[in-house]
Design a protein with these regions (language model features):
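Flexible, glycine- and charge-enriched loops at secondary-structure boundaries
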Residues: 27-34, 68, 72, 130
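Alpha-helix-loop-beta-strand connector modules within alpha/beta enzyme cores
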Residues: 2, 7-8, 13-14, 63-92, ...
């Protein structure tokens, strides 16, 4: 991932999942979620983005620190399928700042990076209060994924 940040501007294409099973807007069709995400990823790759990130942006309310297991499991399955077809850097983001779940998912699917919304600063909003987590991920360097603070940069592993 270090070569990804060579000083040139990059475009990271976002694959926003449809609402996941723990969400009130979930329509009960996990195959539709998978297919929609794969089509988005293929389109982004075909359009020449530099990297892809998978995110559960359509889940409301967004939970602070972790998401329900049924959503996490389906999101991990989708991430694995996207990783299999993705020849460019691939990352995951779980709203809001589910750093530990993101780290484990990235490790499980061989993702290249994660995105953390509250890396060095505390955040508050409709999701509740999220303390900065910059010290906690450093204890989990057993995986090869790279992590990035929100709009701040990051550290290589």
């Amino acid at each position: 991932m270090k070569e990804f940040f060579d000083g040139k501007k990059k475009v990271i294409g976002m694959v926003h999942l449809l609402p996941l099973p723990s969400n009130a807007a979930y329509k009960g069709n996990k195959d539709e979620i998978v297919q929609f995400a794969l089509e988005d990823a293929k389109t982004l790759i075909d359009c020449g983005v530099d990297a892809i990130m998978l995110e559960n942006f359509n889940d409301w309310p967004q939970y602070a620190d972790e998401i329900p297991m049924e959503s996490y499991t389906l999101m991990t399955a989708v991430a694995s399928k996207i990783r299999d077809l993705c020849p460019i850097p691939f990352g995951v983001n779980i709203e809001m700042n589910a750093w530990h779940q993101e780290w484990i998912m990235a490790w499980a699917v061989n993702a290249d990076f994660i995105r953390l919304e509250a890396f060095v600063d505390n955040r508050g909003g409709s999701f509740g209060y999220i303390p900065a987590c910059s010290k906690r991920p450093c204890n989990h360097l057993y995986c090869d994924s790279w992590y990035s603070g929100d709009l701040v940069g990051g550290m290589g592993t």
